[in-house]
Amino acid sequence: MTDSLPFQLPRRPSVTLLRQGDGGRPARPAPNQPMAGFESRFTDIVNYIVRITDEIWAERAVGYIYDTYDANCTIYSSYGTVRSVEEVIASTVATLNAYPDGELQHLNVAWSGDEQAGFYTSHLGHSRSTNVGRTPWGPGTGRRTSIRFVADCISHNNRIHTEWLVRDNGAAVRQLGQDIHAVAQGIAATIQIETRLVSPEPRLQGQTLRARLELDETSVEGWARALFHDVWNLRRLDWLKSRYADDVLAHAGGGRAAHGLRNYQALVLHVLAAIPDGTMRVEHVSWSEEADGVVVAVRWLLEGRSAPGGVLGECPPGKPVFMMGMSHLRLAAGKVVEEWMLFDELGVLAQTYR
């Protein structure tokens, strides 16, 4: 499976494969990864993430959050920062009240780390539900929603202490029949306790144009960082053909999809058009070896100034914004054949109205 990869994978313990389970449930192998400090029932870090997610969200064990999140946990999103387990519980209760019949599908959990240093996981999931109760955007609508999310977490001794969360709220708002710009203006009018300051980086470094990074592209992290820099910072979309399959399938924020390399390039341009002076920064890289190929997970940040005409629509121009994103890239025959590119355009759009 790994012979044709453009990078080398280091040896590490085998873990649960999500796409080999019965009826969408992950297989439960014999314990195969050291998990000191975690409950003995968890066989590996993927098993831990999937099971606590199912128990909290599907089985309604909301109070189990006290056992799996640190009391002073920090959760980052496009809307601000949460710094308390009580806020996590309050948000979970409100979401379950708004979407009481939610169904979860676990698409991938990339990971890194170990029991001593702690584990980093990037959990890509798909949620289907009916909006019955009030959401932050208004009363229940009775409409169905189908959205993806990614939660990147750092866990140690059975508790998550840091998380970065991206939920496709752009798709959710549209599926609920609401105007995304009106919703964004409402969010912008609310008071935030903690906001992120954005100072866009200049595109030029003095009189010197941006150059390729000197990286070891035989490593997973080096390969991913070089890819994102070449495409998003150097804007060399023509180089995609050496890394992406001609029939690549992409799923992006806002419920967007692209099939084929040409359409994938158009998708990237649509994102860049919204932040045309944007600078891409890769913040973390992890990976998983699934039944249908290796998946590389990248947490990234795109910072710059807003412009109308891209994924943000007719937004106020020239506003400093940041787009927090997570991408999961599945490889086969040495190239990317499928990508999940998650970002929350609603959260970015709200920044343009502040």
Each predicted region: which residue ranges?
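C-terminal and inter-domain tail/linker signature
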Residues: 2-354
